[in-house]
C-alpha cells in the first residue's frame, strides 16, 4: 500500500503560513497606509487601508475597530513627531531669551507643517475624526498651546513686551503660526504673489514683524 498523502486542507494551511504577513508590523503598516490615503485626498477607511497594506479586509480590526480609531492613531503619532521637533529646536537654544525662543518655536512649527502637510491636516482639523475622542492628542495639543503661552508669559515677566494684554498677545502668537500654516496648506500664497520656494523666507519675515510689533522699544 502506498504512503498516505497529506490532505488538501493541511496543504492549504501550510501555504497560508508561508505567505508573507505583517505580524507585529501590521499596525505600523496600516497607519502608513491611512496617511498615504489622506495625503492623496482619498477617502480613508479601515478597509481601504487594509487594501493598500495588502492584507485581508478583516485583519486590521484587531488593531482598529473603526475609522476613528485608525485616524486617532495616525494623529497621535503625528502630534508626537510635531512635539519632538519643536522640543528639539528649543533644547538647542536653552539660553536664548523668550522672544528668540518664540521665533525658534514659530519657525519649527511652520517648517514641520510645511514639510508634513498630510500630518498637519490630520491634527489641525476635524475632517478625519473627532479630536476630542483622543485623550493623548488633546493632552499633547494643550501642552503645545501652553508652551506658546509660557514663552510669551516669560517675555512679559522679563519686561520685554510693550504694554498690552498678555492673553491678546498669546492668542495673536498662536493665530500667527497656526494661520500661516493653514494658509500654506490651503494654497493661499500664490494668490499673494509668494511662490513655493519663498514661503519659508516669508514665514521668517512675518515672525520677525510680529516680534518687532510686541517687543518693547
Regions found by a protein language model. Give the residues of each.
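N-terminal intrinsically disordered/low-complexity leader segments
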Residues: 1-25, 217
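Generic hydrophobic, amphipathic alpha-helix propensity
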Residues: 25-34, 49, 74-78, 82, ...
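Helix-turn-helix
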Residues: 29, 37-69, 73
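Alpha-helical DNA-contacting segments of helix-turn-helix folds
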Residues: 38, 71-78, 123, 140
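Hydrophobic alpha-helical connector segments
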Residues: 73, 87-119, 169-173
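Amphipathic alpha-helical linker/stalk segments
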Residues: 76-102, 138-142, 153-157
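Short secondary-structure transition hinges
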Residues: 111, 115-150, 196
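Hydrophobic/aromatic-rich alpha-helical bundle segments in the mid-to-C-terminal region
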Residues: 132-138, 142, 156-206, 217
Amino acid at each position: 500500500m502506498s504512503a498516505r498523502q497529506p490532505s488538501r486542507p493541511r496543504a492549504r494551511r501550510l501555504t497560508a503560513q508561508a505567505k508573507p504577513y505583517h505580524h507585529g508590523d501590521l499596525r505600523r503598516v496600516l497607519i502608513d497606509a491611512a496617511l498615504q490615503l489622506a495625503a492623496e485626498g482619498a477617502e480613508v477607511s479601515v478597509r481601504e487601508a487594509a487594501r493598500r497594506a495588502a492584507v485581508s479586509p478583516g485583519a486590521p480590526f484587531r488593531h482598529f475597530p473603526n475609522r476613528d480609531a485608525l485616524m486617532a492613531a495616525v494623529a497621535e503619532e503625528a502630534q508626537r513627531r510635531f512635539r519632538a521637533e519643536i522640543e528639539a529646536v528649543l533644547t538647542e537654544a536653552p539660553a536664548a531669551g523668550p522672544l528668540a525662543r518664540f521665533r525658534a518655536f514659530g519657525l519649527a512649527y511652520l517648517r514641520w507643517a510645511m514639510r508634513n502637510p498630510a500630518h498637519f491636516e490630520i491634527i489641525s482639523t476635524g475632517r478625519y475624526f473627532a479630536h476630542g475622542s483622543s485623550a493623548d492628542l488633546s493632552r499633547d495639543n494643550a501642552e503645545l498651546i501652553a508652551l506658546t503661552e509660557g514663552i510669551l508669559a516669560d517675555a512679559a515677566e522679563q519686561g520685554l513686551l510693550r504694554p498690552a494684554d498678555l492673553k491678546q498677545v498669546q492668542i495673536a502668537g498662536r493665530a500667527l503660526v497656526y494661520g500661516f500654516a493653514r494658509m500654506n496648506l490651503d494654497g493661499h500664497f500664490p494668490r499673494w504673489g509668494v511662490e513655493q520656494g519663498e514661503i519659508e523666507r516669508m514665514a521668517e519675515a512675518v515672525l520677525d514683524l510680529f516680534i518687532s510689533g510686541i517687543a518693547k522699544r
